[in-house]
Amino acid sequence: MAQLDTLDLVVLVALLVGSVAYFTKGTYWAVAKDPYASSGPAMNGAAKAGKTRDILEKMEETGKNCVIFYGSQTGTAEDYASRLAKEGSQRFGLKTMVADLEDYDYENLDKFPEDKVAFFVLATYGEGEPTDNAVEFYQFITGEDVAFESGASAEEKPLSALKYVTFGLGNNTYEHYNAMVRNLDAALQKLGAQRIGSAGEGDDGAGTMEEDFLAWKEPMWTALSEAMGLQEREAVYEPVFNVTEDESKSAEDETVYLGEPTKGHLEGQPKGPFSAHNPFIAPIVESRELFTVKDRNCLHMEISIAGSNLTYQTGDHIAVWPTNAGAEVDRFLQVFGLEEKRHSVINIKGIDVTAKVPIPTPTTYDAAVRYYMEVCAPVSRQFVSSLAAFAPDEATKTEIQRLGSDKDYFHEKITNQCFNIAQALQSITSKPFSAVPFSLLIEGLNKLQPRYYSISSSSLVQKDKISITAVVESVRLPGASHLVKGVTTNYLLALKQKQNGEPSPDPHGLTYAITGPRNKYDGIHVPVHVRHSNFKLPSDPSRPIIMVGPGTGVAPFRGFIQERAALAAKGEKVGTTVLFFGCRNRNEDFLYQDEFKAYEEQLGDSLKIITAFSRETSQKVYVQHRLREQAELVSDLLKQKATFYVCGDAANMAREVNLVLGQIIAQQRGLPAEKGEEMVKHMRSSGSYQEDVWS
């Protein structure tokens, strides 16, 4: 019998672990809820405000026959849930409510009435994990020991009365594409629940999320109408929120939100715990440019979390709460005829008791657009279509109706141009859309979301300071007639310019309210929170690691190397550390070149930095090419239990690296190609292959 090497043993252990996981359904471990996620109240959250966690009681109290649950990390699933609720109400007369999965308990789902329906709109986060607000529900419903109030076992089909609808939001560049909705659907089917229509899946990786959603929902509504005896009617706009102007208050009134994220911030007394619902206003203590070319920017920033009680671990993410650019705020207010009253105070209230107001209130039109609404995002065909009834003239109405009904035409005129809502409407007419209710804009646009960045420092080395590394987005995409500018990275560039002595920062022609609402961010501050990641160094520092991180994908690996250098300086044994780094040109965008050179001198042969420069010669060289060239080294380190890490572009680089690694394993061991692929999959399941990727 051939002798087993270490990687083979790792694979066997992974198979054993996988088998235990399968048969125990995770009894011995579970998806970890983000330790930094807040358990505090969200604005107008019914259950979180101390009210019932019994969803059936809530539906009975409020006269609802349709609940739409969402599991959302960035706000998209929540937006889709709200859109489904609105459409169900307006087109089919359903009494709908939107519900955050973490607001309720689920032991009484076996008593769900037959004449009601539950929707589940679930995003898959990271490596096939539930979003933070869906962790507890997911653990409950998929658990082997799931127990309902009736005491019925899974074999007795306790959810036979439950009618449900599912839609998943995923990304096909990730290994576990739409795992959440698939696993939930299987669990509900096993428990006897009746799915209405197909289990929908949207693919952000292919850029078809919106069209996948639109294509799925029409046959779903048909199936639901048949199952529940619904009659479609002409959809007429019915506001979810009541927006009123308050002439008794001015923008200077201390009770008016001018961009403050919470009541504590409004009152000038922000208190922790700081989280995704309550950011810390952190000082930026250092900011500098990493590129040496003038037409592109990459920022290094040091953000202090001293005194906040925020903590992080090497490999975690930091969330930056952005501000919309002044030019886009002005454009939006002009398009909707709000420029003259931008500083008027408005109150926003939910017409239905279950409606959650996404914006702090009272506020102003300007503050809502600048700090709270995602006005720069690509606009959806469905939302554009909803504005037809409020068009300034018949010709514009006809054009909007065509855009709404013809997906190819919409793709040509709007999607290809990467237009946001204001740009899209400006491309149709110069007349303002003054008749559009502001409530419709709040309903149709997402809340402005924090953007996440891989932390590029070690918590062991600087526990009170977080480093971030970010390329500033200002690119002309194929087909677009204008530069597409990143919301957060250009905001950060403006802060860097101001900190470094430029009196009037205007990155790529944009200006920002740098000092924040009521000058509360003066002195170069930015709102942040920390999010836990499973992207971690081995607990044993003597274990080898292989890191693949081109461009800003090197960010977490700077932290990894920083930490290993600190451990080595303390006399600890540090395993072989290999970094595959790629960029265009060593003299233009080789990030942290001098730092890495110093670490190489300190760590000697234990640190190997292997570079790939794509534009130095006529032949483009990428990290996957260097990986293949170093096949023997990679194979040897895997035999020594090396952990393999990838950070960066999911759509191309990460896929290529995954493929090349499988080929290396197969070739170096004389195995069939499919065996190499299988071994990489087992490395993933055992945690010895980790990704921090984006598309």
Swiss-Prot record:
GO terms for biological process: ergosterol biosynthetic process. Its cofactor is FAD; FMN. Pfam families: FAD_binding_1, Flavodoxin_1, NAD_binding_1. It is found in: Endoplasmic reticulum membrane; Mitochondrion outer membrane; Cell membrane. The chain crosses the membrane at residues 9-31. It is a single-pass membrane protein. Residues 32-695 are cytoplasmic. Residues 1-8 are lumenal. GO terms for molecular function: flavin adenine dinucleotide binding; FMN binding; NADP binding; NADPH-hemoprotein reductase activity. GO terms for cellular component: cytosol; endoplasmic reticulum membrane; mitochondrial outer membrane; plasma membrane. It catalyses: 2 oxidized [cytochrome P450] + NADPH = 2 reduced [cytochrome P450] + NADP(+) + H(+). NADP(+) binds at R296, T552, S614, R615, K620, V621, Y622, V623, Q624, E656. Its EC number is 1.6.2.4. Residues 66-221 form the Flavodoxin-like domain. This enzyme is required for electron transfer from NADP to cytochrome P450 in microsomes. It can also provide electron transfer to heme oxygenase and cytochrome B5. Involved in ergosterol biosynthesis. PANTHER family: NADPH--CYTOCHROME P450 REDUCTASE (PTHR19384:SF17), NITRIC OXIDE SYNTHASE-RELATED (PTHR19384). Belongs to the NADPH--cytochrome P450 reductase family. This is NADPH--cytochrome P450 reductase. It comes from Aspergillus oryzae (strain ATCC 42149 / RIB 40). The gene is cprA.
